[in-house]
Amino acid sequence: LYVSTEPWSVSDPFYQRSYAYQANGRELFYNLIHLSAHRSVLPVAYQFVKSHLKLSKTHFYPPRRALDNADPLVVFAESPRPSFPDSVDFPACIEQVAPLLQTAPRWLDHISTVATGENEIAMGLFNISEHLNKSVLTAPVRHSVIASKDYSQHPDRVSPVFDLAAVQLALAQFPMTLLPEILGFTLAYCQQPSALDLLTAGLGDKWHQDLRDPLLIETAAIRSGQVSALQGLIKRYETDAQAAGYGATWPRMQQGYGLYGQLTERCVKAISERWGRPQTDEQLIEALFKKLASSAQGHHVQALLGGKKLDHWFAEQPFNSREFMAALTASSYVNLQAIERSPLLALFEFKGPMFGVLNNEDLRLLKRWLEAGGRQSAMRPHSIQTVVGSIVREPQEQCRQTINFETLSNRDLFYYLVNSECYPEVIDSATGRVTKVLRLARWLNKVPFNVYEHDRLDQFIATIYQRGITGYQAFKAPARVSKATYIWGIEQLAPTILADGCWLQGASQLQFSPYQAVGDLLQKIYSDEMGNGDVLKNHPCIYRRLLASLNIELPLVHTRDFSAHRGFLNSAFDIPVFLTALSLCGNRFLPELLGVNLAIELSGLGRQYMTLRDELKYWQIDSAIVDVHIAIDNVATGHTALAREAIALYLDQVQMIQGSEVMNQHWHRVYQGYSALNTAGARFKAALVLQYLKKRF
């Protein structure tokens, strides 16, 4: 059972770095979407989730019978049906909940990794996530827009929506630590109505049922269709946890369930209040000043307001908008007797020093506010502001001793990379290891062509494939290598094959990048490596069965005992460390990752694999792991084809945005990644040959 019973903790230096981040849903939403550049936000994300779990009310908790309920849609906390003004329609509902639609079910993105690749609970959740991701209802907002800072800070969108969206993204980072809560959260997502379900119920007759059928009904059916499988997983998890001595896990699952229900209700309530209770011009102008303050510093060196330099006003964190507004209305910049003659307004006129800073709508708002004397006034239709909520930062429950990852061997580093959820500080070391291998690969290998064209890539792949397959001959007994040698080699390959697919375990992070389509292709390959959640097709599980058939008993990959296994060569960890480290580096090495992926998929084809399959069968050794790679890695429609498509699509996008010269530079990086696989494995290959010559099985 892969679960942590200890509080999540990090080293003190890493925790101190987290104080650079604000602990509110809007900021966290943005930083988690850009996690590869903001790893230090993880302690904030963890505390954010834990704080909301503590605040979840028991009346949202499901009773025990929820695990046996035949009705797939259950509401345990009934809320009044909302009623909205006539101006509110279905697109308005979609716009408000877009962050929720784009982040569901993202909390399951990392449920199946190297650490959990053989865990049946994780595989079951991975399978469920595959179904939930087929939802037909998505927000008509580009991912690139949602990933922008302005989107999460826009006052037209209520903060509780970003709280829930941030929780959905944050849960994904703790699949081991918060597994019980994730199980409960997912069950609630599948059983309870979503925020959009509840909002559209408030539209009443304005939105006809025949429009609802192809949208919400089908999406709800996809969710409810996973309830039975989830109930089975939860029961299995409880049994396993009890057998392992972890105690009762149902209360934690209830908290996760209640978390979804409570935050969903908060979203609906906040949106309903927003639509039902218009805001004032004072609130709107306050939001405008807050927005302008961050970029105004440095432009008003001499100007004074209320006896204080303007730059000092703008430098304050947080910006004191209330005092600023009071000082402004009391200053000589505003003529309350004749607003049109106010020096403040002249600043924004054509040829004025601040012309263009405010648009026409902003100027009308400013005039309305000034005409009301700078006081609270009735609102006319305009954008709506909301106060950004925040959690109280708590002291870290436990800080570990700092680990110097730079001094660790690949064997020792492997454990921390596999368990990076619990050791996020390892990412810096991972980046360093990857950089060293890539640098050496660039020095040792010459790119086959400098100017990229699709036809040249196709020819390159065809040449490699033909070179690999040419010379294959039908097997004739006896085998060239002894059975004992094969058994020993199978054991040595365990760290690599039991981590199969690891290089793509972070591909889901591309969902919010300009390369979403590239990420979809990589995710398809990764899903296949994981058997799409099927234990019979899961590659690590196939290899584990092979090991068992040869009486090779190895600890689970995520344990210290695995990397400490004395039967492994030290260099057996070179390839999995490189690949796992690469997966943790986010989008920084995307072109290199695409090249590595192509090299791996092509390596599963050709006469070597075909001869290996023949000889394994001769020795009556299960060849399933070889068979499956020969089949799914094929050049025509398999993983090699997807790898080629991902490279071509990526380089097309680079060319479109940055031009041909930059595209060619990125092609060089792709090839550098392609070459790096051999570079990373060179020491291991040499050690295998040397040990074979020594042992002579």
Predicted regions and their residues:
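Extreme N-terminal leader/anchor segments
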Residues: L1-F60, S383-K446
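Compositionally biased, flexible interaction segments
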Residues: I33-P80, A287-R322, L328-T329, D412, ...
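Active-site-proximal alpha-helical scaffolds that flank and shape metal-associated catalytic sites
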Residues: L55-A221, P251-K290, P448-I625, S675-A682, ...
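Histidine-centered, metal-coordinating catalytic motifs and their short helical/loop contexts
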Residues: S129-N133, R212-Q231, A338-F350, I625-E645
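Substrate-binding/catalytic groove segments of enzymes
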Residues: P193-D197, P343, K351-V357, S377, ...
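Acidic, carboxylate-rich catalytic segments that either coordinate divalent cations
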Residues: I222-Q283, A631-F697
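Aromatic- and Gly/Pro-enriched helix-to-coil junctions and flexible linker segments
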Residues: W275-F405
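Intrinsically disordered, low-complexity regions enriched in proline, serine, glycine
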Residues: G356-V357, A624-V626
